[in-house]
């Protein structure tokens, strides 16, 4: 398999970082081909390897891609049914491997690869990492993730000593490897203030039962479908709902309008889930409503609409969800499917809360030390992927740099399209055409800059 240029660059940097610094993290947005990256890296490093995933279906999905990248490698599996360490690379789900009886079977390894590496400091992963290091203290660890910032605030320093590279979403869109998101902030009547005051659980996420109480009303579900039909009636769509009951009611609202919709959740059996995902990928189901099932690792390239029908207190969760719709389409795999962008409809205030889809990153060869944890990270990174330290940088975008459409009031929904790829979610307007009075209206506030007689005044207010 021939790697894309940015993949080749990242793999080369990762190999060099493993040799120089030891345990290494790489950050790439959803859709960058992280499985290809980790497979190519593992193939070049060689030795006895373990590739760790957090879901069973990802184990088989990643093993298949590994064979495509490394056709001569022997691949083994370790799960509930198969326990095979004979291959050059063994794929395992962490929940299976972290049990004491399974940990004792781990052989001496040369390389441990962790997919979705932001999970690496969780207790189940730490048990596997400790067992691997006990067998071979010199075993190298490589992790790849789209979202290094964990919701619980835990840094990754205990596992990784450096970040070899970080790809930006904007750069992959510019190169044509991801499609551009068209993002719409959709406010259902009477929900904005209630969503803004939701209680958070011990994990730091919003209470989804409270979110359900706000969003799961028949009139709201009908409004969601009505707005979806205006923007994405012909698009394959993934909907993220707050609870299973909410998902079922949302799917019913779609079906009431003649749209083939289905629900997948943690309660769906593995057999039924596989069948539903296959039907969705093949086009038999147009809208798939899910509850925390398709957030990570799921890949259906024709998806061109994502509906956030729930709030996200963690930016990483929002990024994973939106990333489901940003992949480009392989014409050989999906003949006749044309995809140029992805419509993102946010009914849960996530875009209002988090403002953008990434930290601003410049791709540079030079590294700098993080003053907080000492990790070596790319110079352009403004937030350390290892510990979360935030570097001081320039402020928000200057007036005139950002565009958005004027709000469109539709029945009981206020819908506003915003350019979420830019640093600021609002547009500056020249009130009198003289450049002396500039006014901007954002999601929740307004700002004005006035100039006269060589002096400048700034005014801010809350909407």
Question: What positions do the PLM features span?
Answer:
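C-terminal helicase lobe
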Residues: 282, 316, 326-428, 433-435, ...
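Conserved RecA-like P-loop NTPase helicase motor core
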Residues: 95-98, 266-361
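Post-DEXD/H (motif II) to motif III coupling segment of the RecA-like Helicase ATP-binding lobe
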Residues: 119-184
